[in-house]
């Protein structure tokens, strides 16, 4: 309590479950401090209740943040949140994954999906915190290692650190070499290659080359795509390749 009173705290981000107690305590001691809630967009029961000013139950929820995968918000929780919380925002699955990856890399901290939602809100500018002293309450590190592996990959994709490219090639010698040289010149790392020339719907003289790359950021991905296009290669989506 004494620390809360003495510190120049500006904003607190919190997920739904504990926010009622946290908000009550903070507002009782420092009513000027802003308190924000964060929910997964696929399980936004309290977000809807807060903004629609009515208590409601979702038909279904869809999020890997199972700690906040709640269809019906608690009645007492809703009453306290309505009184003490300033706003509630939502974050996507990709944003949560990026937050988990950021916590691992920058803070050496393993957070579960629900615990990382406040960090996701901060990273993706969901609320006005620039220039303010802000606290994100990261509550929970209970995440399955198999899920964690997928989350890390998703976070890399979202942050431009990993990308899948599908290229339509003429099936003749030298094409793969040209593509490899362009990627090498751009400084990306190839971690996966799949060469598909056997689909019955594909032109006899053509093939699809699917590459999985490790990259620095979105700017490097664009550089690679632009150079491949300038060299005469056609980039297609995964969905397009799957249809051929």
Language model: regions and residue ranges:
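N-terminal glycine-rich dinucleotide-binding loop that anchors FAD/FMN and/or NAD(P) in oxidoreductases
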Residues: 54-67
């Amino acid at each position: 309590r004494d620390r809360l009173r003495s510190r120049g705290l500006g904003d607190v981000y919190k997920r739904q479950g504990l926010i009622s107690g946290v908000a009550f305590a903070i507002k009782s001691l420092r009513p000027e401090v802003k308190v924000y809630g964060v929910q997964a967009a696929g399980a936004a029961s309290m977000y809807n209740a807060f903004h629609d000013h009515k208590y409601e139950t979702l038909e279904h929820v869809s999020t890997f943040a199972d700690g906040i995968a709640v269809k019906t918000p608690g009645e007492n929780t809703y009453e306290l949140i309505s009184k003490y919380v300033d706003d509630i925002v939502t974050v996507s699955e990709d944003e949560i994954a990026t937050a988990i990856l950021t916590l691992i890399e920058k803070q050496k901290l393993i957070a579960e999906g629900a615990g990382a939602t406040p960090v996701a809100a901060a990273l993706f500018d969901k609320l006005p915190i620039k220039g303010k002293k802000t606290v994100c309450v990261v509550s929970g590190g209970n995440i399955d290692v198999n899920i964690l592996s997928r989350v890390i990959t998703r976070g890399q994709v979202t942050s431009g650190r990993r990308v899948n490219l599908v290229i339509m090639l003429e099936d003749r010698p030298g094409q793969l070499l040209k593509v490899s040289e362009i990627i090498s010149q751009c400084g990306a790392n190839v971690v996966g290659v799949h060469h598909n020339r056997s689909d019955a719907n594909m032109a006899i003289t053509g093939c699809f080359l699917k590459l999985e790359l490790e990259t620095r950021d979105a700017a490097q991905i664009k550089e690679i795509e632009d150079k491949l296009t300038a060299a005469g290669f056609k980039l297609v989506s995964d969905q397009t390749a799957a249809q051929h």
